[in-house]
Amino acid sequence: MWINITKNTFQNSDFKGLNFLYQIISYKPTSSIKPRYNIAIDTEKVKNSVNFQLLKTIEPSLEEFLEAEYNVYVNGTDIPYKVTSQKGNQNYTIEEAIVFFNQPVSIVLENNKNDASFILAVIKHFGNDNGYNKVQDHIDNGWLVFENAGGCANIPNFMEGFLRKFKILAAKNSRNLFDYFRGIMIIDSDKEYQNQPIKPAHKTILDKLHGLLIDISGVLDASDLLTNQNRSIHILEKRMMENYLPKEVFQEIIRQNSVRSNSDLKDWLDIYLNLIAEEQLDFINIPDGNLYGNHSTVPTELNTLWGNLGGNFAKLNQGFKFYGFKTNGRLKSSKEGSFKSEMPNWFKKAFVTKQNLETRDGNGELQRVLDKIATLL
């Protein structure tokens, strides 16, 4: 991310604030290959200002460093954030910039304890660029954090509380609170089939976010179908995070003796592993089954999706009642573990790779999620 500190900032700002901002922007931990930010300053325009001369007394190699940075910047295509007194969508005063750039980027999840494993797998396998994983580097330095919203329905409440800390700053600068948010909300869709409009509960969540003046444009089309063209909100295109687990995970589970001796688990896995329709794998409710949902009248789409199972329907409809393994390899009971806490751990396994994640993904969504996160950094 490029940050341009403009001429009027050098001419009109308090040096203490300018110096503090410069240290935030230019700081690079010794363990990192790259700094968090790139800084663009046209030294020809600012080098005669009092503030620049003062900054040089603290940073003896300032001019050489900034000229090298600026040469990279002018030959690139990145649109910078600006630190300036002029108004603009990506323009901030020094006071605003200190708050905005010093905060970590947030990935808001329904449950960060469980769901983070999925996102970390996406970052690990899709974020590597010539041996450098920028997103992982930001996590390692505390510049990118996972936030726990406390459930899907609670996301608007979480965001309202999160944004409250910007209230005074926003009022002082006549801005929306959301202008200071650096992050993305990632939400399960709970969709039951491919072209299902967003569920009323999710529409309510979006409406509440809109009521907080959070931009929800591009999440849905006019028919309430997912388009996911919003930079700060991503609703998963499959049913839930577990639907992105590669088949290799379930193949590994069924190899275990304790599973092979449990007829219910073995039967469910045998049927699941023989499903060939991607839409079935994308939208099956893995833990609960209940293939036709809770509709008073079963939608045609669900009849089409699951009506070809024959005698396998009843077994698959029971759901995958798997709660994890004990250290001795035996199965945990529902009192000892839970599907939601155990299954995300499988994203960490060595046999989960970019290739089998892409195969299960099928349309490049995981790369798009990674790209959305990366643009925030």
Question: Which stretches of residues belong to each language-model region?
Answer:
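Short runs of predominantly hydrophobic/aromatic residues within well-ordered alpha helices
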Residues: 105, 115, 241-242, 366
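Charge-biased C-terminal accessory regions appended to nucleic-acid-, cytoskeletal NTPase
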Residues: 7, 32, 39-50, 299-377
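Generic structural signal for hydrophobic core residues of well-folded globular domains
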Residues: 122, 248-249, 253, 350, ...
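N-terminal extension/subdomain marker
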Residues: 1-89
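Short, extreme N-terminal segment that most often corresponds to the first beta-strand
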Residues: 1-15, 186-188, 234-240, 376
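Activity-critical C-terminal alpha-helical subdomain
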Residues: 194-330
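RecA-like P-loop NTPase motor core
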Residues: 62-191
